[in-house]
Amino acid sequence: GFGDPYLAFKIGLVGAPALTLAEFMKHKPTFQLYAYGGIYVPIGDYDSDRLLNFGTNRWAYRFGLPMVLPLGDPKRQTNLEIHPGFTFYGDNDDPTGGGGVKEQDELFQVEFHLSTHFNAKWWGSVGGRYRKGGETTTDGAADGNEQDVLGGEVTLGYSFTPHLGLQTTYGDVLTESDGSQSTM
């Protein structure tokens, strides 16, 4: 089956002018701020009798203010990217495992990356993500699963062509107070 489709938009608020290709090639990037919004549409494959589902049987909405701060020499392309945002969830009125209604609190998340190009082919990044909130309740009873976790990652990438590359990432939970465990 298919999962729920996700539709999103991003619009430049500061430092992201509309440019022709020729103007873009000459443009020196400065601080950029965007408005971001997205919606998960609950039309994916879902059956409350199954433990695993591609769909979620609920609407969800994401909003954020991503920003990019170019640092140093534009020829080496070093950027600090910060993407704070919130996700708001609708109710699932037919949750897996029974029960009448599953609700979920809003989830705050901020993701950040410092990336640089070492030369025309090699690039690297360090970053992380903090998540707080998102506890679910089933029929009004708290499920005790609020997220409060900070993860970190390092990435090394190689570009074979401008459109084809390879990257490897290592990530881990740095600190948590919710029992989260993950290594990738």
Q: For the regions a protein language model found, what residue spans apply to each?
A:
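Outer-membrane pore/translocation modules
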Residues: 1-104
